[in-house]
């Protein structure tokens, strides 16, 4: 189990079932990125979402998920997802609209103000974790020291690398969900970690909610004029 190198998983006689996302949700997040992928830098997930070695960068943001509208927005307020070339050290917004994913960003590294990230691309289905159910990898209590959201029982699913062309690491990344459900019965999405263009990224989700006004932020969304474009984004899958 890949988590064994970091923490001892809580014994679970029967693996938990894969979680289902709520009909809508809002969550704040922090994203930590390190360009290091040498043997001295352990793969995520990291305690408190922070790698044990320098260098690394920490950013903030929020996500709004509304699959009934065919929409999801991820606002990265400090730096973007580390898959863009030559680097992603710029703020960005990635959103799904009308089966297309767009990137809004400043005019940096040939991006901006808006480009098409992917076509035929929609928010993840609410039951997307069912396809990964077999990759349950253990549960932890002690991933958080200063991050309360990580100091609870979390179930982890670690995905194998789908393409040998990306990197020589044995895994692509993983998902962490809190065992304790929300009042609605849905389980909060706590963590997502993955391999970037170089290095690793680890997102930690806080203030996850499936009720309240923030879950309706996309109700009146309209495609920005700057995104009426055929310009494709330059990124590395």
Where are these regions (language model features)?
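N-terminal leader/targeting segments and the immediate start of mature chains
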Residues: 1-71, 108-113, 119, 136-149, ...
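Short acidic, Pro/Gly- and aromatic-enriched capping/linker segments at domain boundaries
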Residues: 127-152, 156, 204-215
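Non-transmembrane domains of secretory- and envelope-associated proteins
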Residues: 3-16, 139, 166-171, 178-237
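Alpha-helix initiation/capping motif
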Residues: 15-26, 125, 146, 150, ...
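An acidic-aromatic
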Residues: 53-133, 193-202
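Short, solvent-exposed coil/turn segments at beta-strand boundaries
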Residues: 22-24, 62-73, 89-101, 150-154, ...
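Exposed regions on extracellular, virion, or secretory-pathway luminal proteins
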Residues: 107-111, 121-128, 145-150, 162-169, ...
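Short beta-strand segments that buttress and anchor functional surface loops
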Residues: 29-31, 49, 73-79, 152-169, ...
């Amino acid at each position: 189990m890949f988590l064994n190198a970091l923490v001892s998983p809580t014994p679970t006689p029967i693996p938990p079932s894969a979680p289902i996302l709520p009909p809508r949700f809002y969550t704040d997040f922090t994203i930590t990125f390190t360009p290091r992928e040498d043997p001295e830098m352990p793969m995520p997930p990291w305690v408190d979402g922070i790698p044990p070695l320098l260098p690394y960068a920490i950013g903030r943001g929020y996500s709004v998920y509304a699959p009934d509208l065919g929409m999801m927005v991820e606002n990265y307020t400090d730096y973007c997802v580390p898959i863009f070339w030559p680097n992603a050290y710029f703020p960005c917004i990635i959103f799904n609209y009308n089966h297309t994913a767009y990137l809004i960003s400043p005019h940096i590294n040939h991006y901006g103000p808006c480009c098409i990230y992917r076509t035929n691309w929609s928010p993840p289905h609410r039951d997307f974790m069912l396809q990964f159910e077999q990759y349950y990898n253990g549960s932890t209590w002690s991933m958080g020291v200063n991050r309360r959201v990580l100091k609870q029982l979390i179930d982890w699913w670690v995905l194998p690398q789908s393409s040998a062309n990306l990197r020589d690491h044995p895994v692509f990344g993983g998902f962490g969900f809190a065992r304790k459900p929300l009042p609605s019965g849905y389980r909060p999405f706590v963590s997502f970690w993955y391999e970037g263009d170089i290095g690793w990224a680890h997102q930690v989700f806080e203030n996850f909610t499936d009720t309240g006004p923030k879950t309706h932020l996309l109700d009146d969304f309209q495609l920005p004029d700057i995104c009426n474009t055929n310009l494709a984004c330059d990124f590395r899958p």
